[in-house]
Amino acid sequence: MSAITGRVSTYHREKFPEWKVKLVNEVKEKLKENDVVLVLDLVETPANLVHKFRKKFRKELPYMKVIKNNLVRKAFEQSGIEMPKEMDEQLVGSNMFIFTNDNPFKLALKISKFSMPAPAKPGDVAQSEIVVPAGDTGLTPGPILSTFGKLKIKTMVKGGTIHIAKDTVVAKPGDVISPELASLLQKLGITPMELKMKIKGAYIKSLNRWVPAEELVLDLNKYKEQIQEAYTNALALGVSIAYPVPEVLKLSVAKAFQDALKVAVEAGWLTKETAPYLLSKAYAQALALVGALGDKAKELGIEVEVPAAPAPEAKEEKKEEAEEEEEEKKEVSEEDLSAGLGALFG
């Protein structure tokens, strides 16, 4: 029996690099000091945009750093914080992490407004209306004139350069930029595109919740409309239950008066406030009765005259007469009104 001897190799795991240990501890410290971790997506984000962003927000956001995703996961784990599943799923690719105690919604709004102009590339989608302004382009006449013609931009040659005759819209929001248009815009020095930092979301430690970008960046106009609608609904509810606050009581009193007036008119209760409505109601009922009787009304000698529309008062004398008649009407007593109604309906 032969003995077979072999070499047994043992695997020695390389020691965790010192710089990684230091960075994980740094992230742990920032997690301890701050309530919010904002995550920005750096995939396909130009370096000059990141540089300008850092420069603009350096004082406001002292700690913003590109960190490997696994090191952030490690820092959460060692801090005893369970990373939400939604956040873990977003930690792919290159990301910038911002640690802060600022309101995440306000911060996201500020970041969403930060942008940098950029030239249009073929295949880009126009974000807004693109206008080529009238004036001297500084370009010399040549084959480029055919490009202007293809894009329906009217031109003329003056002093050896191409002049655009009038402001021309060359693209509307949603239009795809053609190679010809992209080339021309670059030659004219027009940078119609806007580059922005892409927000993935924010982790709020006090809530142990991940807030995605679509919930983080608020549409202020939409929220304003919702608040206005909520206020209107609350006011309507307050009026319906007569809630005793100044804003509601003004409307509640007016509503109570209208409701009381309606009930009084329905009940035929005669007062100076209900008299005009009662007369109108009685007159309408009389017209309806005559209409229902048809020819029989004439046989019975019942006629109701439809009052003619008052003629416009052209002279001062007519105005005075009208005022006098109005005063006479006001002097009619409640007894006379009651008698008139009684006579009308028998």
Swiss-Prot record:
Coiled-coil annotation reads none
Query: In its keyword annotation, does this UniProt entry include Calcium?
Result: no
What GO CC terms are in its UniProt record?
cytosolic large ribosomal subunit
Keywords in alphabetical order: Ribonucleoprotein, Ribosomal protein, RNA-binding, rRNA-binding
Its GO biological process annotations read:
cytoplasmic translation; ribosomal large subunit assembly
Region of interest (Disordered), ranges = 305-346
Mark out the compositionally biased spans (Acidic residues).
322-337
* Keyword Cell cycle annotated: no
**MF annotations from Gene Ontology:** large ribosomal subunit rRNA binding; structural constituent of ribosome
Bridged cysteine pairs (disulfide): none
HAMAP family, from UniProt? Answer: Ribosomal_uL10_arch
- Which function does this protein serve? Forms part of the ribosomal stalk, playing a central role in the interaction of the ribosome with GTP-bound translation factors.
Q: How does it assemble?
A: Part of the 50S ribosomal subunit. Forms part of the ribosomal stalk which helps the ribosome interact with GTP-bound translation factors. Forms a heptameric L10(L12)2(L12)2(L12)2 complex, where L10 forms an elongated spine to which the L12 dimers bind in a sequential fashion.
Identify its protein family: Belongs to the universal ribosomal protein uL10 family.
Under what name is this protein listed? Answer: Large ribosomal subunit protein uL10
Q: Which organism is it from?
A: Ignicoccus hospitalis (strain KIN4/I / DSM 18386 / JCM 14125)
Lineage of the species this protein comes from: Archaea, Thermoproteota, Thermoprotei, Desulfurococcales, Desulfurococcaceae
